[in-house]
């Protein structure tokens, strides 16, 4: 499966070796027919013609086993909120989604979420708007606009991905996870000093990027804490210090942010 292949590839690369995929036996006609996007991407990005050359490969993040906790009808614990697709965890894939199965979440549960939300809306009054939440988020946006930016946003964004891959990615252990968590806490504080250079209020891509980075840091902390809680290996979650799978580990790790930077983590059958 993908997680086993990813570990095997990375293990070779950590030992200084390169790993390649060989598609030359397929021939140019079959490659253009069956793998046109891969053929074009390899040519454009790496200058490699996969019908004649080996293509160097490496593992990357593909899918997150987890998401917003929902029931089988896509309902969340927040009234009037339904979730589907890759933002949600309806628990159909377990610890490792296999290739070709992504349509289940998007098509099947996407349709179900729409139907259930419609049924629910017809039988409910709209909840009153909590303007305190609106004002809180408006204040956050205004703080991002105010002030001069002295931090390198791109460097911070790149470091998030690198640390998460190196310390909390394919191979994990208690030490690496703690190091990743400490660094994310540091970056989360640093992200408060990010401000927009572009002060325009209309379609401000810089503002969106800063908000996305703040969300990514919050999510990274949640992923790390969940990985620290699960003292076993299961699917794509591989702990070098706990390489075995526990029978009693067949349960969800649920995480909830009680307030900024403070999480509650627990198992739920």
Please name every model-derived segment:
Residues 8-14, 63, 69-83, 87-269:
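Glycine- and aromatic-enriched mobile tails/lids
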Residues 36, 41-82:
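FAD/FMN-dependent oxidoreductases across multiple families
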């Amino acid at each position: 499966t993908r997680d086993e292949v990813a570990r095997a590839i990375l293990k070779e690369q950590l030992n200084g070796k390169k790993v390649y995929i060989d598609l030359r036996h397929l021939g140019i006609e079959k490659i253009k027919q069956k793998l046109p996007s891969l053929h074009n991407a390899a040519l454009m990005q790496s200058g490699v013609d996969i019908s004649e050359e080996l293509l160097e490969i490496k593992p990357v993040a593909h899918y997150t086993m987890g998401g917003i906790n929902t029931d089988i009808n896509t309902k969340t614990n927040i009234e009037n909120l339904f979730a589907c697709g890759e933002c949600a965890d309806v628990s159909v894939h377990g610890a490792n989604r296999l290739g070709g199965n992504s349509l289940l979440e998007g098509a099947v549960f996407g349709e179900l979420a729409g139907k259930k939300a419609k049924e629910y809306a017809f039988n409910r009054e709209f909840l009153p708007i909590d303007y305190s939440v609106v004002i809180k988020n408006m204040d956050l946006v205004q703080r991002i606009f105010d002030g001069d930016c002295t931090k390198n946003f791109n460097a911070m964004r790149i470091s998030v991905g690198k640390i998460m891959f190196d310390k909390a990615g394919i191979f994990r252990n208690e030490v690496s996870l703690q190091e990743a968590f400490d660094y994310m806490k540091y970056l989360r504080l640093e992200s408060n000093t990010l401000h927009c250079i572009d002060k325009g209020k209309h379609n401000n891509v810089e503002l969106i990027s800063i908000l996305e980075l703040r969300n990514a840091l919050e999510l990274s902390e949640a992923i790390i804490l969940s990985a620290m809680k699960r003292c076993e290996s299961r699917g794509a979650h591989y702990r070098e210090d706990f390489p075995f799978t526990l029978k009693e580990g067949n349960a969800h790790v649920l995480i909830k942010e009680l307030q900024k930077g403070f999480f509650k983590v627990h198992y739920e059958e």
